[in-house]
């Protein structure tokens, strides 16, 4: 299935648009159905099995709910984490930041383009349902930038395959709104399969790359520095 990138409605809506609010709520449900927070928590714990992470950056963080669910799973073993949530829109509520604080995670939200976020290094950078928005040229640029700022990059994206595409057309049946139903199909068509992200990673030497299908609907990519 050829990768096709098209604009998504949610990206063009103001954060306070009722359709955007409803669609973000839908996305929280979809992430739960896909099990993406379980996948991310498991990958983090496997990669940092001998010590907890201290600094984590999420790019394309949306409303922050995804990383919050991940934090709720790992916070008992990983306290006092500094988390930076980066998104192009101001979507993260005070309630979400307070929920992070209740887990002893210090969290900051930055409104910034992913290509212009603060020049800092982090133990790990994560992304969930975000990279599929970019074509290969921009992806290569983004991956090159990330490889210089972290020793671990974990990504979960839509799996570009017939079964996820079929299921994406049925989201109306679980009450998702028109924005979500439209964007879900586009997201799967722009998703990844095989080793497409590995092929775009700028440094092969000194990195361990893992890329595979994860569950029924997701695609997992991990780049971990070995030297």
Q: Where is each model-derived feature located?
A:
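Class I SAM-dependent methyltransferase Rossmann-like catalytic core
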Residues: 12-43, 47
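Conserved beta-strand signature within the Rossmann-like core of class I S-adenosyl-L-methionine
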Residues: 150-159
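A conserved beta-strand element that flanks and buttresses the S-adenosyl-L-methionine
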Residues: 126
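Core SAM-dependent methyltransferase catalytic element
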Residues: 209-227
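C-terminal alpha-helical "lid/dimerization" subdomain adjacent to the S-adenosyl-L-methionine
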Residues: 158-204, 211
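A short, conserved alpha-helix within the catalytic core of class I
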Residues: 134-145
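N-terminal auxiliary segments of SAM/dcSAM-dependent transferases
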Residues: 1-13
């Amino acid at each position: 299935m050829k990768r096709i990138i098209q604009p998504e409605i949610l990206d063009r809506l103001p954060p306070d648009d009722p359709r955007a609010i409803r669609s973000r709520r839908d996305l929280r449900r979809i992430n739960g159905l896909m099990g993406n927070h379980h996948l991310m928590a498991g990958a983090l714990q496997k990669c940092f099995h001998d010590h907890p992470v201290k600094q984590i950056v999420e790019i394309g963080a949306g409303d922050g709910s995804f990383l919050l669910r991940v934090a709720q799973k790992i916070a008992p073993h990983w306290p006092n984490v500094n988390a930076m949530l980066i998104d192009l829109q101001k979507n993260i509520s005070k309630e979400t930041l307070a929920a992070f604080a209740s887990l002893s995670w210090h969290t900051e939200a930055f409104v910034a383009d992913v290509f212009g976020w603060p020049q800092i290094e982090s133990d790990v950078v994560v992304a969930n349902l975000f990279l599929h928005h970019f074509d290969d040229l921009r992806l290569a640029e983004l991956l090159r930038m990330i490889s210089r700022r972290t020793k671990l990059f974990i990504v979960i994206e839509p799996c570009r395959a017939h079964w996820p595409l079929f299921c994406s057309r049925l989201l109306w049946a679980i009450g998702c709104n028109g924005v979500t139903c439209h964007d879900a199909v586009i997201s799967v068509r722009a998703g990844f399969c095989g080793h497409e992200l590995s092929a775009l990673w700028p440094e092969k030497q000194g990195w361990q790359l893992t890329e595979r299908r994860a569950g029924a609907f997701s695609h997992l990519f991990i780049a971990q520095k070995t030297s």
